[in-house]
Amino acid sequence: MNQLDALRQWTTVVADTGDFKQLAISRPQDATTNPSLILKAVQKPEYRPLLDEAVSKHAGKPLDEVIDRLLVRFGTEILSIIPGRVSTEVDARLSFDTAATVARGERIVALYKAEGIDTEKRLLIKVASTWEGIEAARTLEQKGIRTNLTLLFSFAQAVACGAAGVQLISPFVGRIYDWYKKSAGAQWNEAASAGANDPGVKSVRQIFEYYKQHGIKTEVMGASFRNVGQIRALAGCDLLTISPELLAELAASNEPLAHALDAKAATGGDVAKVSYDEAGFRFALNEDAMATEKLAEGIRAFAADAVKLEKLMQESGK
């Protein structure tokens, strides 16, 4: 049995890509997209017609709506291939606006419903894990709209998401690893910081065990992997969203895979339950330099790619 099939025994495998033509190869249950992945996809000749079609079909509509329609087009193509759910992201420029995030999430849901998609079972609305984003997700969940809280780098963010009753969180393993590696500079010891000792892996394990111990139903989906060692160290996590390149690497390996995270074992933990009001959340996040920097950086990057996507659309419409 290869490692990808072994992983499927304990973990729902999710493909992290906008390149839906690769999905038939890796056979994931779910798929995730983000503005950067869609931007990357539409720059390939085989996907450029989707962008041109969105622009020509919806000429005269606001660019933000045309982008949402493009995201939904990619999402519906993905859903025609996979059996499970797709995650579609709200514009990162709305990360600090609760009401606008709710409105955009509702619009994306309406667009999927117009395509005949059962959104309650097959769609997750991705929202940045800011205080405003988490509160927007709380409202969306109360309306029956399932959410995926992304750009999650800290325990405080995970606690707030669990309290809000969100469907799923996406802690970013690789970006946490990147920060600690850069921060350590010449002192970084790769061997000593690999596998279970990887700072990103440790963060996900802490969140996973806390959720299971306290009966929090929110699903944990490790994301943003830099190497297969990080994935192997999280075998047993509820879900893992993995790039096509790393999925292929797992499929090519027949080395034994250990069951690293055990939900049943985690229920016996003794970590006290934590709660945050807005002030407490903001202070806890501020105390975590890595999470503060990576959250801000991630929002900036996704927002910049949304702007690039708008520019491509403007050029296409000329």
Curated annotation (Swiss-Prot):
Enzyme Commission designation: 2.2.1.2
Subcellular location as annotated: Cytoplasm
UniProt keywords, alphabetically: Cytoplasm, Pentose shunt, Schiff base, Transferase
GO-annotated molecular function: transaldolase activity
InterPro entries: Aldolase_TIM (IPR013785), TAL/FSA (IPR001585), Transaldolase_1 (IPR004730), Transaldolase_AS (IPR018225)
One GO biological process term: carbohydrate metabolic process
GO cellular component, as recorded: cytoplasm
Active-site residues annotated for this sequence: 126 (schiff-base intermediate with substrate)
Family matches, as Gene3D superfamilies: Aldolase class I
Top EC class for this record: transferase
Pathway info: Carbohydrate degradation; pentose phosphate pathway; D-glyceraldehyde 3-phosphate and beta-D-fructose 6-phosphate from D-ribose 5-phosphate and D-xylulose 5-phosphate (non-oxidative stage): step 2/3
Catalytic activity: D-sedoheptulose 7-phosphate + D-glyceraldehyde 3-phosphate = D-erythrose 4-phosphate + beta-D-fructose 6-phosphate
Family indicated by similarity: Belongs to the transaldolase family. Type 1 subfamily.
Subunit: Homodimer.
Role according to the record: Transaldolase is important for the balance of metabolites in the pentose-phosphate pathway.
This protein's name: Transaldolase
Annotated gene: tal
